[in-house]
Regions:
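Short cysteine clusters
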Residues: 53
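Extended beta-strand/beta-hairpin segments
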Residues: 1-48, 56-90
Length: 90
């Protein structure tokens, strides 16, 4: 069964719908790659997904240990390479 439906909206923007909940993520190409930069870029979501995944695993362990992990934060920095354009560091 599919998890999401991604639709290209034009102008280097996509809409991703989570099929189980209906929640939506909009992505937009960054200004330095011909986009408007008005939303997370696809590579931003990759970097943020890594932090979210780490926090989810840490939250599971915190629950097991009866430790309050709520309100923990992370700042995510993504470094892009060129030729080809790619994530080189998170």
């Amino acid at each position: 069964m599919a998890t999401s439906k991604v639709t290209y909206l034009g102008d280097l923007r996509t809409s991703s719908i989570h099929l189980a909940s209906g929640s939506e993520i909009i992505s937009d190409a960054p200004i330095d790659n011909n986009g408007k930069g008005e939303a997370f870029s696809p590579t931003d979501t990759v970097a943020n997904a890594l932090a979210s995944c780490m926090f989810t695993v840490m939250g599971i362990k915190a629950q097991d240990l009866n430790v309050d992990f709520s309100n923990s934060t992370a700042e995510v920095t993504k470094i892009m390479g060129t030729e080809p354009r790619r994530i080189t560091e998170i």
